[in-house]
Amino acid sequence: VLSPADKSNVKGVFAKIGGQAEEYGADALERMFATYPQTKTYFPHFDLGKGSAQVKGHGKKVAAALVEAVNNIDDLAGALSKLSDLHAQKLRVDPVNFKLLGQCFLVVVATGNPALLTPEVHAPLDKFLCAVGTVLTAKYR
């Protein structure tokens, strides 16, 4: 459960990276594909090379979903309901992949803004990304 301080820290991170969120989303995907090659199986029709327009496009969607979640941090389930349905019912993405992408997103934030990711910010951001993953996998049952 995210505390009020956690929510404030998460909102602060996204306020600082807002203009770069799409780039961060694409970078996180690239890192996930490189580090966890099994995740590529969900994108057989994509050019997965570095700087690929398709990866950038999907990174934009990832960023938009995270921004939507931040903007509705008190109702993550409501904000991400359609996305949860899509991933559970149609795409059937392995739930572990959300955790992997979240970890890659943390790495991107850390490398892009090392001073931003203090322990006081890292823990709430990790909790938030885990909460997003939990919501996205809630409809798998």
UniProtKB/Swiss-Prot annotation:
UniProt-annotated binding residues for O2: 58
UniProt binding sites for heme b: 87
MF (Gene Ontology): haptoglobin binding; heme binding; iron ion binding; organic acid binding; oxygen binding; oxygen carrier activity; peroxidase activity
Keyword Zinc: no
S-S bonds: none
Domain Globin: 1-141
Expression sites by tissue: Red blood cells.
Transmembrane segments: none
One BP term from GO: hydrogen peroxide catabolic process
Family note: Belongs to the globin family.
Subunit composition and interactions: Heterotetramer of two alpha chains and two beta chains.
Protein name (database record): Hemoglobin subunit alpha-A
Naturally occurring in which organism (per UniProt): Passer montanus (Eurasian tree sparrow)
